[in-house]
Swiss-Prot record:
Name of the protein in its database record: Acylphosphatase
Lineage: Bacteria, Bacillati, Bacillota, Clostridia, Eubacteriales
Domain of life: Bacteria
Catalytic activity: an acyl phosphate + H2O = a carboxylate + phosphate + H(+)
Acylphosphatase-like domain: residues covered: 3-89
Active site (UniProt): 18, 36
Record GO terms (molecular function): acylphosphatase activity
Keyword hit for Hydrolase: yes
Signal peptide region: none
Length: 89
């Protein structure tokens, strides 16, 4: 199990992007959260097996049809074993 942080830039606020992330995470049995930042970016922390996180990243890069992702900055994080679901803030 691994945990990643994705800082997503582009048209990602006000277009259902966080809820799209939550849906994709649930399909892949991932936990974590997606949160709007004041600068217009979305911060995502996601946790699960490496191949599912790779699939998740591909899905969010392609977006939901309303969003437009310009870039995703990625960072490795420490696994949170207490986390049980994917949330949006």
């Amino acid at each position: 199990m691994i945990r990643k942080e994705f800082l997503v830039s582009g048209r990602v606020q006000g277009v259902g992007f966080r809820f799209f992330c939550k849906y994709q995470a649930s399909l892949l049995s991932l936990t974590g959260y997606a949160e709007n930042l004041d600068d217009g970016q979305v911060l995502i922390e996601v946790q699960g097996d490496e191949s599912s996180i790779r699939k998740f990243k591909t899905k969010i890069l392609n977006g939901n049809g309303f969003s437009r992702v310009i870039s995703i900055d990625e960072k490795d994080l420490t696994v949170d074993t207490r986390e049980k679901r994917f949330s949006t803030y």
